Swiss-Prot record:
InterPro entries: Ac/propionate_kinase, Aliphatic_acid_kin_short-chain, Aliphatic_acid_kinase_CS, ATPase_NBD. The lineage of its organism: Bacteria, Pseudomonadati, Acidobacteriota, Terriglobia, Bryobacterales. The gene is ackA. One of its GO terms (molecular function) is magnesium ion binding. Substrate binds at R99. This is Acetate kinase. It comes from Solibacter usitatus (strain Ellin6076).
Length: 414
């Protein structure tokens, strides 16, 4: 089964074609046929496409919306220039899987998209106003392109965290605010966490119930999650992805009183304050330079700028602080797993975060940490009671697999 995996954003569309079926899932032999993305949708877009084993192609073209971006991708896939031998027409795409950010309390697992499911996603727009509307546009664009008979599946970022106990997801606010408006912790990066937990237990030959880890998904968005017996028991992101760790442009944890103070002092509306916390804070806000950790590390090596150094220190300190808190909540863990763009590619950041965790039994192997590149790798010393691993995430693979299972009515694996 050739599954088109889509991740629709406000001005971008990421896609992959993954060949998979129940037998391939069992053998862990899924095939990625191509991948790519469309950026700067709404103007002169940049379209990058790369078939399996083929050269990367980058072009620019006017793309006005998500539907036009998908149309461009599908025309490329069906053309002789794509290099994807398995796709010669739209009929060679058998299903579409979508990343959907917020499923609220309704969607506890992935779901075949029906009108009722689509309405449920729309009902969660208040919880994810920046994300769910774009996810819906991707679903509707695929329905228009393929017709209503094409099976589509929604895979929710929040679903993995529906196992949180109420003492972990409720805020210490008047209970009626939760009852009326469902104001609570939902957590995000769930598909990434689920994949990393699956890959870790596969590498270690563990059952789900034997999987006790802390994951650090570190990219432009960052989160820490405690996974006990294979299930999420607490996570740093909250009702929105703004809470928790320091991120590329998001503040993470703040004293709530700061919001009204900023509004008063700077003359900003609540919406403008929220936008500031989402787009002008984090690494960018502290450094005053960029939200890109790779650039910050390079700048620090060349100039030793105080604000850049401070941004990196605060980022690592907050992550280490969350590891300690989650270890206490779990009563200990077997491993800390790094994933995401920074987690997978910045050994210096991993080393900084783990420094000082010797009390918990974690000691980094400097050589292993430096060598890790694009593959799962233990980076702690063999004698460490608390291991550290790098495991590259693959959310698209899980979306494709969930799509197959949902369409065939197969239960999700433990």
């Amino acid at each position: 089964m050739n599954v088109l995996v889509l991740n629709a954003g406000s001005s971008s569309l990421k896609f992959q074609i993954i060949a998979t079926d129940l037998e391939r899932i069992q053998r862990d032999s899924d095939e990625r046929l191509c991948h790519g993305y469309v950026e700067r949708i709404g103007g002169e877009a940049i379209i990058t496409v790369e078939p399996r084993g083929g050269p990367r192609k980058k072009v620019t073209a006017p793309v006005r919306n998500i539907a036009a971006a998908l149309d461009y991708v599908l025309r490329w896939l069906a053309s002789d220039q794509s290099g994807v031998a398995e796709i010669r027409s739209l009929s060679d795409v058998h299903a579409v899987g979508h990343r959907v950010v917020h499923g609220g309390e309704v969607f506890r697992e992935s779901a075949v998209i029906t009108d009722e499911v689509l309405q449920g996603i729309e009902d969660c727009i208040d919880l994810a106003p920046l994300h769910n509307p774009n996810n819906i546009k991707g679903i509707l664009a695929a329905r228009d392109a393929f017709g209503s008979g094409m099976p589509q599946v929604a895979v929710f970022d929040t679903a993995f965290h529906t196992s949180l106990p109420d003492h972990a997801y409720l805020y210490a606010m008047p209970y009626h605010l939760y009852a009326r408006h469902r104001i609570r912790r939902y957590g995000f990066h769930g598909t990434s966490n689920r994949y990393v937990a699956y890959r870790y237990r596969t590498l270690r030959q563990l059952t789900r119930e034997q999987t006790n880890i802390i994951t650090l998904h570190l990219g432009n968005g960052c989160s820490a999650t405690a996974i006990r017996n294979g299930r999420s028991m607490d996570t740093s992101m909250g009702m929105t992805p703004l809470e928790g760790l320091v991120m590329g442009t998001r503040s993470g944890d703040l004293d709530p009183a700061i919001l009204s103070l900023i509004a008063t002092k700077e003359g900003l509306s609540p919406t403008e304050v929220e936008a500031l916390l989402n787009t002008q804070c984090g690494l960018l806000g502290i450094s005053g330079v960029t939200n890109d950790m790779k650039v910050l590390l390079q700048e620090l090596r060349e100039h030793d700028d105080r604000r850049i150094r401070l941004a990196i220190e605060i980022f690592c300190y907050r992550a280490r602080k969350y590891i300690g808190a989650l270890l206490a909540c779990m009563g200990g863990a077997d491993a800390v797993i790094f994933t995401g763009g920074i987690g997978e590619n910045a050994p210096e950041i991993r080393a900084r975060i783990c420094a000082g965790l010797e009390w918990a039994g974690l000691e980094i192997d400097s050589d292993q940490n430096a060598q890790t590149m694009g593959r799962p790798q233990q980076i702690s010393k063999p004698e460490s009671r608390l291991q550290a691993w790098v495991i590259p995430t693959d959310e698209e693979l899980l979306i494709a697999r969930d799509t197959v299972r949902c369409i065939l009515g197969e239960p999700h694996p433990a």
